[in-house]
Amino acid sequence: ALSSAASDVYKRQIYICGKVFKWLKKMGGLSVMKERNEEKAKILYDFLDQSKLFKGTVRKEDRSLMNVPFVTGDAELDAKFVKEATAAGFVNLKGHRTVGGMRASIYNAMPIEGVEKLVEFMKKFEKENA
């Protein structure tokens, strides 16, 4: 038999899953979340596809709705972007330590407005640094 301490781990996971499922239902269900995630990804990818400074690093047919990696092509400029973005309230944009660049994680809880604000910031950064 599991000790109560060991089973508490599972209880916590089930509790958190229940909270997430209720939130998803409140937001309109999976089909609504899928539409929201597609819209968020489109906003960001459309900007990256036309940007003179930022470039997506994944082929169009392989793109994720949740994690959007991108680069400037210059490691120093990438670092400057991450630093300025963090100061502006956009956190955890630094890419994987072995790959570099940046990565925007636009999971379910990220509102569309958050992605729009990120793109606005990226446009400003591009204007100042391209």
Go through the PLM ranges and name each one.
Residues 80, 87, 96-130:
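PLP-dependent enzyme catalytic core of the Aspartate aminotransferase-like
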Residues 54-85:
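Conserved PLP-binding catalytic core of the aspartate aminotransferase-like
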Residues 25, 69-71, 106:
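Short, well-ordered beta-strand elements within core beta-sheets of diverse protein domains
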Residues 14-22, 42-45, 79-82, 116-119:
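Predominant activation on well-ordered alpha-helical scaffold segments within soluble catalytic domains
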Residues 1-6, 10:
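Single conserved hydrophobic/aromatic residue that forms the stacking wall/gate
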Residues 53-57, 89-95:
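A short linear hydrophobic-aromatic micro-motif
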Residues 22-57, 83:
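Conserved PLP-dependent catalytic core of the aminotransferase class-I/II
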